[in-house]
């Protein structure tokens, strides 16, 4: 599986795509009372270097939550996690059985970080990998660690990331969903997260998959 993930990571690095992040603060009735919305294109520069470009105006009308550097690192690295041969050694994995997801026969694995040092971010949760080609098709868990100090708290929601095949070969993230209540000292705060990864195009080619 890690070998397949390394192939997936290398292939995804050859694609441009659009990343749309929406985070809603919800009141105790489930109504939105604050929102963060941002669209980024992950593209190549004229020098063929990978870069990001914000599209349009970023809306930040959050009232109680504040997005931190760790949140943006998680959006970039944890929610669309790829468990390559270079990163898998950071994790303990345990077999949890098998399950059919959307008609796909999968192995189910528990994945937890072996050790967390200062400043590191990891995934803690479950993954579903198809039995046929070992592609990861689903992740459920959260980014860790939570960060608590006397003066501040930085808590992170549970999420589910779904992958779909792009160009009929490798499975790339297409959306991340999270709906969780974070237990701050000042009181619980429910939030709803949605990240869409769309318009995948191989550099110099046309896209064959655009999620809706």
Task: Please place each PLM-identified region on the residue numbering.
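Structured extracytoplasmic
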Residues: 1-123, 131-137, 142-157, 165-175, ...
């Amino acid at each position: 599986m890690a070998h397949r993930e390394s192939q997936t990571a290398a292939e995804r690095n050859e694609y441009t795509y659009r990343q749309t992040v929406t985070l809603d603060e919800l009141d105790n009735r489930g109504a939105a009372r604050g929102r963060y919305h941002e669209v980024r294109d992950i593209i190549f520069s004229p020098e063929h270097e990978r870069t990001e470009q914000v599209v349009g105006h970023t809306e930040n009308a959050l009232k109680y939550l504040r997005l931190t550097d760790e949140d943006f690192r998680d959006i970039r690295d944890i929610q669309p996690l790829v468990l390559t041969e270079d990163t898998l050694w950071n994790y303990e994995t345990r077999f949890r059985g098998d399950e059919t997801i959307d008609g796909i026969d999968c192995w189910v694995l528990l994945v937890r970080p072996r050790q967390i040092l200062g400043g590191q971010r990891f995934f803690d949760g479950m993954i579903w990998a198809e039995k046929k080609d070992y592609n990861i098709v689903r992740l459920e868990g959260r980014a860790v660690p939570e960060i608590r100090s006397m003066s501040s708290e930085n808590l992170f929601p549970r999420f589910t990331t779904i992958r779909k095949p792009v160009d009929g070969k490798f499975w790339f993230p297409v959306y991340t969903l999270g709906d969780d209540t974070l237990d701050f000292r000042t009181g619980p705060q429910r939030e709803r997260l949605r990240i869409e990864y769309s318009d995948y195009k191989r550099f110099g080619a046309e896209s064959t998959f655009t999620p809706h």
